Design a protein with these regions (language model features):
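Terminal alpha-helical segments
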Residues: 1-136
Length: 136
C-alpha cells in the first residue's frame, strides 16, 4: 500500500470521526478529511471558474510588477483545479493535505495524468525545525 493510499484512508476515517463528533455535539456536520460523495460536475465547473478568476488576478498582479503578491493567487489557482478533480471523482475534501494525497492516489490509480512537479509545490520539508519550508 502506497503512502498516498494510506493517507487517503486516514483522511476518509478522519472525516467520519469529525462528522460523528459534530452529530454527538449537535453541531452542523463539518470535517477536516475526505468524504466519498456523489460526483458533481456543476460544482467541479465552479471550482474551474474560481481557478480562472484567480489566474486572471495573478496575471494582473504580475503585469503590474507585483510578482510577490501573485503567489497566493497562483497557489489557489492550482488548488481550485485539484478541488475540481476531487469533486469530479466524488470526493469532498476538508483540508489541503488530504486533497494533495487524493491527487497522488488518483494518479497512482491511473485516473489522472499529472506531473509530479505539481505535487512538490504543495509539500513541506520535515526538518524538525518547525519552519515548514517548501520543498525545492
Amino acid at each position: 500500500m502506497s503512502q498516498a493510499s494510506k493517507h487517503v484512508g486516514w483522511c476518509l476515517r478522519k472525516a467520519q470521526k469529525d462528522i460523528a463528533e459534530c452529530e454527538k455535539l449537535g453541531k452542523k456536520p463539518k470535517h477536516r478529511g475526505l468524504m466519498k460523495v456523489e460526483s458533481d460536475m456543476e460544482e467541479a465547473k465552479r471550482h474551474i471558474a474560481k481557478a480562472e478568476h484567480n489566474l486572471i488576478i495573478a496575471e494582473y498582479l504580475i503585469n503590474g510588477g507585483f510578482t510577490d503578491a501573485s503567489v497566493g493567487n497562483i497557489f489557489y489557482t492550482m488548488y481550485q483545479c485539484f478541488l475540481s478533480i476531487a469533486t469530479k471523482f466524488g470526493y469532498d475534501t476538508g483540508n489541503q493535505t488530504c486533497t494533495l494525497a487524493l491527487m497522488e492516489y488518483l494518479k497512482e490509480q491511473g485516473k489522472i495524468n499529472l506531473d509530479d512537479k505539481f505535487f512538490k509545490y504543495f509539500k513541506y520539508e520535515d526538518e524538525g525545525d518547525g519552519k515548514g519550508r517548501k520543498k525545492k
